[in-house]
Amino acid sequence: MVVDKIQAIRGMNDVLPDSTSVWRFIEQTFINCLVRYGYKEIRFPIVENTQLFKRTIGEITDIVEKEMYTFNDLNGDSITLRPEGTAGCVRACIEHGLLHNQQQKLWYLGPMFRHERPQKGRYRQFNQFGVEALGITGTAIELELISICRRLWTDLGFSQSVQLQVNSLGEINERQKYRSILVEYLHDHFHILDEDSKRRLDKNPLRVLDSKNPDLQHLIQNAPKLIDVLGDDSREHFQSFCNGLETLGIPYSINPVLVRGLDYYGQTVFEWVTDQLGSQATICAGGRYDMLVEFLGGAPTPAVGFALGLERIFLLMETLNLLNESNNKQSIFIIATNEEAILKALVMAESIRNAHPSLDVITNTAGGGFKSQFKKADKSGARMALILGEDEIAREYVSIKDLRTEIEQISIPMTKINEFLQNYLA
């Protein structure tokens, strides 16, 4: 009987064992960094009430109009697979009273879903790492988030391959004033606009500045600048932020058409971009969203955050040949040639794991000849092989072969293996 194979849904990819160690390294680097800064993890559902995203992201956005996975459940309620994390994080904070006269510094990690056209670096299920700081005013917290990003890039090895772009969206009344100016400009060039931009023109004209259509880039770059209509308070806030970046020694450039793709942003916004990934240039984006908590029924609460896609980070590290450097944890492969040797290998492996918790120990329990097992050992990336053959078992010795250097193979008593490893791997 021929049975059709079931394959993964387009744009939703499997992460196979050859890649998961690198993913784990990237994830653990993020987690370790945020813990050092005093941020705490929060977890919230993958599925939310559809109104959560319509109210926060904005109904006249590509995400809400075209990209959300929305469906009715068995009760007839409209629910949506989360397309981003900030809205769900804020909803959880309000629901559980985390913002009552409190400041929260939070991080989260997990899958998001958008029905976009799949391409390299952009998928329909993607993994996002997010950071949110709620209840804190001023530019110091914004500068802390930028500092976190810079440390992440340094820890991952590509700090010289990304650049920081910043802008200010000002207060809502300033955006409304700018909106009228921008609409007039765009109407004067209406014949140039694509259908998406024409549709956005009346309801959300700032979205036009977020267009990635190459035919519109000249028009966008020459559009009136929002920063030119900012009031004194917004200018002072943005200047304080820029001064702080200079004090911290963080290079940046002002991008006057940087508006972000979500409706809830105001004041400071930023993106980290790279020239290594073609059209997928943005690897991290964020900004201030002081009105979002109030949008969702909470008390007015200042807030700022950022998010980045792990697939995009993986792709950048792959492009820069950094993946091998990220997977350099020391490990040992134990070669055993028969059933008695395999049992000895299992006992030895547990002893090594007890004595050296940071060391990975791979035991070959499938048997096989020396040649095939050495191939497995080499492919595993292990630094050394411990060999338990018939001669070694008879003498209660273990042979040791360094797989990464030309050091000559040696044999030592089994009882001395932990002492040897302590000295050899120091």
Curated annotation (Swiss-Prot):
Its main location: cytoplasm. It comes from Legionella pneumophila (strain Paris). The gene is hisS. It holds the Pfam family HGTP_anticodon. It is found in: Cytoplasm. SUPFAM superfamilies: Class II aaRS ABD-related (SSF52954), Class II aaRS and biotin synthetases (SSF55681). NCBIfam families: hisS (TIGR00442). It catalyses: tRNA(His) + L-histidine + ATP = L-histidyl-tRNA(His) + AMP + diphosphate + H(+). GO terms for biological process: histidyl-tRNA aminoacylation. InterPro entries: aa-tRNA-synth_II (IPR006195), aa-tRNA-synth_II/BPL/LPL (IPR045864), Anticodon-bd (IPR004154), Anticodon-bd_dom_sf (IPR036621), His-tRNA-ligase (IPR015807), HisRS-like_core (IPR041715), HisRS/HisZ (IPR004516), HisRS_anticodon (IPR033656). Homodimer. Its EC number is 6.1.1.21. Keywords: Aminoacyl-tRNA synthetase, ATP-binding, Cytoplasm, Ligase, Nucleotide-binding, Protein biosynthesis. This is Histidine--tRNA ligase. Coiled coil: none annotated. GO terms for molecular function: ATP binding; histidine-tRNA ligase activity. Belongs to the class-II aminoacyl-tRNA synthetase family. GO terms for cellular component: cytoplasm.
